[in-house]
Amino acid sequence: MMKEEQWAPVIVMLISSVAMGSVNALVKKALDVGVNHMIFGAYRMAISALILVPFSYIWERKTRPQLTFMLLCEHFISGLLGASLMQFFFLLGLSYTSATVSMALVSMLPAITFALALIFRIENAQNLKSKAGVLKVMGTLICIMGAMLLTFYKGPELSNPHSHPQARHNNNNNNGHDQTKKWLLGCLYLVIGTVLLSLWMLFQGKLSFKYPGNKYSSTCLMSVFASFQCAILSLYKSRDVKDWIIEDKFVILVTLYAGIVGQAMSTVVTSWSIKMTGAVFVSTFSPVSLVAATLFDFLILHSPLYLGSILGSVVTITGLYVFLWGRKNETDQSVSKTLNSSQFSQNKDNEDHTIANHKDTNLPV
């Protein structure tokens, strides 16, 4: 029977992954209404900051470091990489494609992070010669193949018996050169957003090491910076103040849901799960978000689904699990080396102790 420490992270991550899948599907629907995607992002980050303020005050007020210029600069960069710029490209890509494609490309995150770690020499290139290294490279390449399939092969639309005839008619009218161009651009924007998120994870790893035990305060400060950054980036599309007044009730509800569940709660749950089980365990739940987004988008929101999205998603998820298999082998090898080293040291100490006792017994009286 599983103990609470074992099943609790599984249950929490399942709920969180399903919620994130639904967030992406709902956000796609909200963007289709015509809201400025960076105004949406600014509201989302502002709501996240407001939600995280009490958590950071109650649990981290005694351990929180002083606000220095360097700390502010670091969190400004963190907000730029992991929130504002990432959302700029990701939400733009989502508006041009679908929730299924967006979640499939996000599943490439571990592989892209590994590739960037190699480029910046955070990951040792010598490790690529091992079995774990070969598996990680294979997984990364398969993920890239899946991304290319998602991008360049849309495929036929799978019929949805629940979709409204008028919606299907409008979708058929939108087919053509412009629609294909938007699809390709959308996939490109999603890949750029995922790369930015990977860069943020590498940067955040160093930031978390520098400021341990302050995940709520750090995320709250990042969200504050990101909300202002998103507001500035929104000017590229519209400078009309009226665009900030959202009257559509559905968009308002989605904005609140995305800020509370998709940003604040997701950050807290993910941070707790990483602390309890590790980042690799958390990465294995990416397909759950993908399946949830697909089902929510197709069955509830009645959006069209394409064959290329399904095939590309399957290839991408296959690459993800090959990569995670390599990570598991690497971890097992590291643990084995540590145990062998510890056993060797213990045997050496016992041997030295035996020799010392033997010498003592041979001393003349």
Curated annotation (Swiss-Prot):
Sorted UniProt keywords: Membrane, Repeat, Transmembrane, Transmembrane helix
BP GO annotations: seed development
Location within or outside the cell: Membrane
Transmembrane segments: 7-27, 39-59, 76-96, 100-120, 132-152, 183-203, 216-236, 250-270, 280-300, 305-325
One annotated Gene Ontology cellular component of this protein: plasma membrane
Domain of life: Eukaryota
Start and end residues of each stretch annotated as Disordered: 339-365
GO function terms (MF aspect): L-glutamine transmembrane transporter activity
Residue spans of biased composition, Basic and acidic residues class: 348-365
Main location: membrane
Topology in membrane: Multi-pass membrane protein
Repeat recorded as keyword: yes
Residues in EamA domain copies: 20-151, 216-324
UniProt family annotation: Belongs to the drug/metabolite transporter (DMT) superfamily. Plant drug/metabolite exporter (P-DME) (TC 2.A.7.4) family.
Name of the protein described by the UniProt record: WAT1-related protein At4g01430
Organism encoding this protein: Arabidopsis thaliana
